[in-house]
Amino acid sequence: MALWAKARVRMAGPWLSLHEARLLGTRGAAAPKAVLPFEAMPRCPGNKWMRMLQIWKEQSSENMHLDMHQTFQELGPIFRYDVGGRHMVFVMLPEDVERLQQADSHHPQRMILEPWLAYRQARGHKCGVFLLNGPQWRLDRLRLNPDVLSLPALQKYTPLVDGVARDFSQTLKARVLQNARGSLTLDIAPSVFRYTIEASTLVLYGERLGLLTQQPNPDSLNFIHALEAMLKSTVQLMFVPRRLSRWMSTNMWREHFEAWDYIFQYANRAIQRIYQELALGHPWHYSGIVAELLMRADMTLDTIKANTIDLTAGSVDTTAFPLLMTLFELARNPEVQQAVRQESLVAEARISENPQRAITELPLLRAALKETLRLYPVGITLEREVSSDLVLQNYHIPAGTLVKVLLYSLGRNPAVFARPESYHPQRWLDRQGSGSRFPHLAFGFGVRQCLGRRVAEVEMLLLLHHVLKNFLVETLEQEDIKMVYRFILMPSTLPLFTFRAIQ
């Protein structure tokens, strides 16, 4: 415990001045008696149609998180942001998140990702919960939760993830020990991406792709390329209404559809294989989420496929980038890294005997992941289309308004997190039982929180556990990494890492 408390931390980006900290406290200014009309809310400057045109021209909005963060500092903790014909409200205080959650209906509404929806409509595929709103969303979500998000489900698939994480560590160790110095400097990002795909497909479909081997099979590589192409084209299509982009970006739409075609073909083959195996007799061992859903038999095959594909598509970048940023922060904060490593070494025997114990035996490592996601939230906003009139920061919010919580600004608000520029995992352990009820929001809140949350958490936790107990992780890069928004928040570049084997 003493080692944790005295671990030195390095700065992690710009922070608000004292004046700005007072402006953006955990609570807004004392509200006047009369609620102010929606039209009186501070508005992000600029022409809403020119803003949309600029986004389309650039086919991205890479600095959106920084632009919105700056706007909060200029306008206060709430403002309107209009793009084209859509009115949005941005907030960044925990109290407003709490009010949004209290106002949640039985089926909270959120924006639908147009490129993904367009593909499914054109091909006649069903939509999974990621692309649904309303009663159908709730029905499917309640049927998925027991086999994906529940603690009993987590206990079942944790050993599968542990096997992949151990293989990753052993493969890396073999490469490191080929060097006489017992160390290796490399770009670890491709290997981490392969790990997340390997682990996720095993949890979902119960099969290994062989991506951690020296020569992965061509089908597995084609699957990776399809996922990469789908995500890249999503970024370039998501910012402009479909009615405009369909004739302005025809090549990109073709690439998007071809990538999805391959992903659906892969999922079809995998699900049919599982279905045929079950038809011959129930497996005597746990063999993944899809098998559990098929055996439960309360969803159609098309619905299972739709939701499995959503989980597949959403399980790669969103897990890989937090892993890489955690390695980066631990590499440039060696005393924090040593404290986390010591925790893993102490718990290793118990986790080796029962991998499920990693969830309870590694509190500091879990706190490090929370700290990474505080500073670098993969999804920079949480959103709700409010179903009834609401008051936020004493402004009237009409029903049907899209409200976005900017996690990037919430996580860097000094009135919410002391010294927010510091990478300090211990803060999450000190805060237990006190402070805001909603400090960790990277996976959303309420009934619409991320369905794949527990899969992602255990994949990150076990990989870091096995890597840190076997290697010292170092980097020469000590400056902050520039983060860009491309559908998710990601590093524009990543430094090389040196892995030194621990004898």
UniProtKB/Swiss-Prot annotation:
It is a peripheral membrane protein. It is an enzyme of class 1 (oxidoreductase). The keyword DNA-binding does not apply. It is found in: Mitochondrion inner membrane. Its main location: mitochondrion. It comes from the Eukaryota. Its cofactor is heme. SUPFAM superfamilies: Cytochrome P450. Heme binds at residue 450. Signal peptide: none annotated. GO terms for biological process: aldosterone biosynthetic process; cellular response to peptide hormone stimulus; cholesterol metabolic process; cortisol metabolic process; glucocorticoid biosynthetic process. Its EC number is 1.14.15.4, 1.14.15.5. GO terms for cellular component: mitochondrial inner membrane. The keyword Iron applies. It catalyses: a steroid + 2 reduced [adrenodoxin] + O2 + 2 H(+) = an 11beta-hydroxysteroid + 2 oxidized [adrenodoxin] + H2O; 11-deoxycortisol + 2 reduced [adrenodoxin] + O2 + 2 H(+) = cortisol + 2 oxidized [adrenodoxin] + H2O; 21-hydroxyprogesterone + 2 reduced [adrenodoxin] + O2 + 2 H(+) = corticosterone + 2 oxidized [adrenodoxin] + H2O; corticosterone + 2 reduced [adrenodoxin] + O2 + 2 H(+) = 18-hydroxycorticosterone + 2 oxidized [adrenodoxin] + H2O. Residues 1-24 form a transit peptide. Keywords: Heme, Iron, Lipid metabolism, Membrane, Metal-binding, Mitochondrion, Mitochondrion inner membrane, Monooxygenase, Oxidoreductase, Steroid metabolism, Steroidogenesis, Transit peptide. Pathway: Steroid biosynthesis; glucocorticoid biosynthesis; Steroid hormone biosynthesis. Pfam families: p450. One of its GO terms (molecular function) is corticosterone 18-monooxygenase activity. A cytochrome P450 monooxygenase that catalyzes the biosynthesis of aldosterone and other adrenal corticoids. Differing from other species (such as human, rat and mice), it is able to catalyze three sequential oxidative reactions of 11-deoxycorticosterone (21-hydroxyprogesterone), namely 11-beta hydroxylation, followed by two successive oxidations at C18 yielding 18-hydroxy and then 18-oxo intermediates, and ending with the formation of aldosterone. Steroid 11beta, 18- and 19-hydroxylase. The sequence shown is that of isozyme 11-beta-2. Belongs to the cytochrome P450 family. This is Cytochrome P450 11B1, mitochondrial. It comes from Bos taurus (Bovine).
